[in-house]
Amino acid sequence: MNINTIPLNIQASFGIPLKFSIIYLQTIQIMIFSIFFIIVLFYSIVFHEIAHGYAAYRNGDMTAYNAGRLTLNPIKHVDIFGSVLVPLILFITNSPYLFGWAKPVPYNPSNFKNNKYAEIEVASAGVLVNLFLVFISVLAFHALNYFNILNQDIVGLIKIIAQINIFLAFFNLLPFPPADGFSIFSELY
């Protein structure tokens, strides 16, 4: 009778650590994906804002350049309230939605050269950068798929990049202030 219980005891003693390590690995994977999500979201917003500043610079306005805002340094783009406090409060309260914003890049339309579409260029530059990042994500997916390098984790990371940037592009096209769509709509009509 003791022989029948030995395998059961061995399975039980190995089963608990195995379950623990699977849960532990899943927790680490969720943490990695969460950190990646935050980094991608933040830098997608930074690229979006830099695009506005660069479009203004291209049209003759040096305001963003002189303010040091044409940089990938994320600290220059952090809005304490919109980039830190609002997302933190939403996270702590287990909100189903998490959002925030960066400091808008300053520009002065009176400095624009004789380009009647300069305001539209500046407003649409951020959206175009987000759509470009979606395009790069799709290209990366197809390239990795072609070379047979894809796995579930890589697909998940690429999906995060694409989804964040699709959301940012379409959200910013809404014709309500302060979204870029409002500026575009205002200039056209």
Language-model features, listed with the residues they occupy:
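Hydrophobic transmembrane alpha-helices and their immediate loop junctions
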Residues: 2-189
